[in-house]
């Protein structure tokens, strides 16, 4: 049998004191009567507290003293006064007021005192020598961080309180970054001197720090330290009694206990139970010995976890810690148990072969790859220069070897080599670097010539020529400039400094102000919200302006998910930003893609930029009849919605399919259900880190796509929001939906009103709400019901939902039945690299030498192969992977027109005639190393004079070529099917094709990729919000004539 004990009364602010116990005694009498009945039966002592419901607590009125929490810790009650009963079983008789103690009188029959006696409240009499000691607090393993000296200091300690300001390193770093970003100009700030207060023993000092956007630190403060709250352990003959509850303020942080004496007890008649010796595990200790309330017997000791014991193990190189068992803070399981295991790194898969971390494999004849962290880093072999007229490439090799000239066959005998007889003309491999041929009975052997374009080449087992895994960087020291001679200009004459030559040395010419300002801001990558600072010459420098002081706090009732626009002073105005901020760490050689709204998204653009649809703007009319501005977000009670280019986009929710013929959506519910159902399953909303469409595809913020032929979706704030077609009323009981239709349709001929000439028949219908509908007018009172006015009578039809075969059917807003979309969308996989997500077939750059490609979830990377150079001391240019000869280097090579001022002061546009070298791409860039080496060896490289003449012809031919290409592109777009030829990739030294699971190309026949460009988009007219959020229409009207649906 259980006793449910509930205290009656709760303290409220401003509650008065004085008077008697109020109505609490009447309520307690019933409990005490029940308690007396229970205590009469042996073995029935138990207490079960009901769940706390503060609304059912009665406020204690006219209390003569303080109010205290009841035994269940839920409701407040009046403290017991002098000569009133206290204590008892489970403390049901209440606690004494301040200044009083609960005294338990010894039984008259000489029995021992137990913990269930009822005491009496008497005046306290206290001496410090009654204290035996303190119980330690209950420590927990806590992890967190604090900002100390501008850095995040993180630790894991076992303590009674949480001394950390931030729960994790990420939250601490975010706060530190926000402080740095919003750090104002504090050079003129005046802060008051803040003195640290002296904290009481029960609290600790928290030093103040400057919050984000402020210069002056907050004052230091004292906060309660639970580790200082120790419960007293009293001497024999004394009880530990709660005197006052903690208030949570420094100085009143701990519950105040005092040792109260009990009447002397004769322990000679007390028989103590045997106490077993406790053996604590190695991670814990045995607590102090405690006595019973009468001081006659000792209580069993217990084991507590040792403080500061848990930590993180340090493993040797090549091994990582792995959790064997989780600790729960109990003795024997105080800490997590770790073991050092060999570090398992992800493997690489290529051509159905699995390679472990560090393994090297051959991609083709000239390309090798090494598996590093699950990513294949690929590089090319380094072939040397041959000094012969005839050469060939041995089978399975990359680098060519010299071949002896053709001699007449004088002795067709064979050759004996390595224990085998080789026929005349046979070739064999003597070792990794030596290849031989039998000519006229004698073996003729030549060695492979290897090149070296890096300082630390890597030898591949079984290969002759080493490979370069990393490019070599050469540091160029600053030039030594000579003094200007025969120059009459001084520092005073050139107030904007002197001009510099290509070596960075002064020349006898003064800089203009424009040249000075351009040089100060060029190459600056800062994104300053309030503009750049200026120097003494009023030139912008690469430092951000602080937040302007004159900006007033914006008062705006608009909800802008992307923030507000700023005026010319850098202050926010009540207008919404069109595009969100795009935090993206990708390096995209062709720039970033844009969504249909013209906003940049974190996705690399392909080499040929696709034509983007025109930008559309406008407000949205929601199905509930409310108008929302563009880019506005709201919640309609079931799903999150967003106005995107004039279209209402709402989240797809997962609902079960109702098993009845007349489902409906009840008020306050989101999913359809049968009329007799009471409990309706709530819809499930997913919250992924990036948008994960139901079909399995991943999309980034701002990206728009078609989930099927009827639904267009966009990625907004990590949620997939979709716009769907509004379906007309269904005037039949069992509509069907075909695969090529977006809305259910009636299989039979729709209902038509009778052509009766009876004038007494009414020409309208009236529903229960008093709405008038004309004859033949149809409408939808809710998403599952369609009605029509027929001959003065309203006839309604309920839509029945067909069964589905998928596990998570989705429900579009404005429709009745959930349906499956997993089978209609092909699934795509993504690549995860360095904490970023890349789409399938997306390319990106790690640095100027390493290019990566995502193929079916596998990341493949390649490095640039640099050709040998004809100069002795090549230089390395910043931003370029391969070194180049000094005579080939032109600062900042570009094909963008540059403004230059001639000697007359006129501005001219000059296009530099140096071609910009492109880096090695995995597929599309063709590079013939032998051809390039031959040009440099023969001195037939590009010359500026030749390129100048070519560029003049290009100025005429390039616009014509571009115009023809644009015409061809538009003709191809208008076709139903497009056939796009993919060019062949050629290996550096022989005309073979690359077959590495990236793109398979047949060089002889060519590869044709079929693209289906037929996509249908539906533009929906605004629904009529007069009838329960849906529209009304004349059934006999032609839908196309009313422009209700338009195909674009």
Swiss-Prot record:
Residue ranges annotated for the VWFC domain, each copy included: 346-403, 413-469, 618-675, 689-747, 763-821, 829-886
GO molecular function per UniProt: serine-type endopeptidase inhibitor activity
Residues making up the signal peptide according to the UniProt record: 1-46
Matching Pfam families: Antistasin, CRIM1_C, IGFBP, VWC
UniProt topological domain (Extracellular) ranges: 47-952
Keywords per UniProt: Disulfide bond, Glycoprotein, Membrane, Repeat, Signal, Transmembrane, Transmembrane helix
Cell attachment site, short sequence motif: residues: 326-328, 904-906
PROSITE patterns, per the entry: ANTISTASIN, IGFBP_N_2, VWFC_1, VWFC_2
Keyword Acetylation: no
UniProt domain IGFBP N-terminal: residue ranges: 47-124
Membrane topology qualifier: Single-pass type I membrane protein
Subcellular location: Membrane
Glycosylation sites: 83, 486, 758, 913
Membrane-crossing segments per the record: 953-973
Antistasin-like domain mapped to chain residues: 481-510, 517-544, 551-576, 579-604
Gene Ontology cellular-component annotations: extracellular region; membrane
Cytoplasmic topological segments: 974-1048
Disulphide bonds in the chain: 49-72, 52-74, 57-75, 63-78, 86-102, 96-121
SMART domains (alphabetical): IB (SM00121), VWC (SM00214), VWC_out (SM00215)
Function, as annotated: May play a role in CNS development by interacting with growth factors implicated in motor neuron differentiation and survival.
Entry protein name: Cysteine-rich motor neuron 1 protein
Organism annotation: Gallus gallus (Chicken)
Gene: CRIM1
